[in-house]
Regions:
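A glycine-rich helix N-cap at a beta->alpha junction
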Residues: 52-79
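Charged helix-capping and loop-helix junction motifs
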Residues: 19-23, 50-56, 88-89
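Short beta-alpha junction loops
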Residues: 40-44, 71-74
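C-terminal structural segments of small proteins and small subunits
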Residues: 77-107
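Histidine-anchored nucleotide/phosphate-binding helix
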Residues: 15-32
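Anion (oxyanion) recognition and catalysis
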Residues: 29, 61, 99
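Residues at the starts of beta-strands that form the adenosine-phosphate
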Residues: 3, 30-36, 66
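Short, glycine-rich nucleotide/cofactor-binding loops
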Residues: 3-19, 41-48
Length: 108
C-alpha cells in the first residue's frame, strides 16, 4: 500500500486551488492509500480553533487521515489552540515520515 505524505504550506484564504488539493487527499484515502496531511508554514492557519474548518478536519480524521501541524509554524503565527483532530508535530517527525517505506510526497 502506498503512503501519501501531503505537505500543505498554503492557506485556503489566498490559495484558489486549496480545495482541489483537499479533494485529492480524500480521494487518495478512498482509493485505499494511507494518507498523512502535514500542515506547515501558512498551511497551519485553518487549524486554529477559531476558524470554520472544524468539520473538515473531523471528516478527514473519520476517514483515517492523519493530520499533523508543525509546532514551529504554529508558534510563529501565534496559534496556541488547534482543533483536536490536528496533532502538533515537528520537523523531526516530518523527516521520519519522508523515509517511511512506499511513501510518496506531494508539496502544496
Amino acid at each position: 500500500m502506498t503512503h501519501y505524505l501531503i505537505l500543505e504550506s498554503r492557506d485556503p484564504y489566498d490559495s484558489v486551488d486549496w480545495g482541489n488539493i483537499q479533494e485529492m487527499i480524500i480521494n487518495l484515502k478512498r482509493n485505499g492509500n494511507d494518507v498523512t496531511l502535514f500542515l506547515l508554514q501558512n498551511g497551519v492557519l485553518p487549524a486554529r480553533k477559531s476558524t470554520s474548518f472544524a468539520k473538515y478536519f473531523a471528516d478527514l480524521e473519520k476517514l483515517g487521515i492523519n493530520i499533523l501541524a508543525d509546532f514551529f509554524s504554529l508558534q510563529e503565527r501565534g496559534i496556541q489552540e488547534i482543533y483536536p483532530s490536528v496533532e502538533k508535530s515537528n520537523i523531526d517527525q516530518l523527516i521520519h515520515l519522508f523515509f517511511m517505506p512506499n511513501t510518496k510526497i506531494i508539496w502544496h
